[in-house]
Amino acid sequence: MGQNSGLLSSLTDWNSTLAGYADSISTGVVMPVALTLLALFMILELYNATQRIAMNGSNNAFTIQQIALVMLKIVVCRWAVVHTTEILNALFEVASTVAVGISGYVGSGEVNTTVDIENAIAALPGGIGNMPVALELMVVGWMLRIVNIVVNTIVAARFIELYVYNAMASLSIATLCYQELHGIAVNFLKSYLAVALQGAVLYLVIGFYPALAGSLGTGGSITEQAWAMLGQSVILLVAVFMSGKFTKAITNAMA
């Protein structure tokens, strides 16, 4: 299993404890506050409707239309707030479907090296003359480990971000009801979808690594191969860092 195999997991499968915390906080702490905000926005929407009715001369047909539209908006927005978790789960499922589809074409991958650096160092003949080579290999080995740690951290941070979104989401969704602030909810949903889709992009990018490593060949000295492997790993690291930018560009393009 590679580093990207965990990206196919659901939020509950990846860490059921954190998923439970997010659900509990959303239901027990954030939801009551969100419903209170929603009630305030409902009052403001009703006030705005009365202002529009007054400006239109209190026409009966227009009055009925405005009140009906406001009531429909209130019902829909309350449903959205109460079912925030289901909405986010649906968005996450869309992203997961993309990731699973990608996994059918790109296998799992991880930051490793076909150059066995530790054994290469151990196999070097003794003597001062080989110390520079050993030091080079040690430096490359440590840098590869750092790349590996950073990639793992970014993968984990993506899940942590989703748990935080799930815990606090209903506050943003509550703004859907109020015309002046509904963009907050829309932008929040775009951001959530971007983070969810980042899993698919990360799976794809990390899955590319074995192909990059395989393109190095076996020519050259052991140090040349090691530095070439490090270069490919750095390319992977840059792509992993840019994964969030890729998905935000996709979701921001949505109307």
Please provide the spans of the model-predicted regions.
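Binding/recognition "hotspot" determinant
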Residues: 1-37
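Non-cytosolic segments of integral membrane proteins
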Residues: 75-171, 195, 199-255
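Alpha-helical transmembrane segments
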Residues: 29-37, 67, 71-74, 163, 174-190, 218, 249-254, ...
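Hydrophobic transmembrane alpha-helix segments characteristic of membrane transport
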Residues: 40-71, 168-182
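Alpha-helical transmembrane segments and their helix-start/interface "positive-inside/aromatic belt" motifs
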Residues: 26-30, 60-84, 185-194
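Membrane-interface junctions
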Residues: 24-32, 36, 70, 145, ...
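Membrane-interface helix-boundary signature
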Residues: 27-34, 64-68, 133, 140, ...
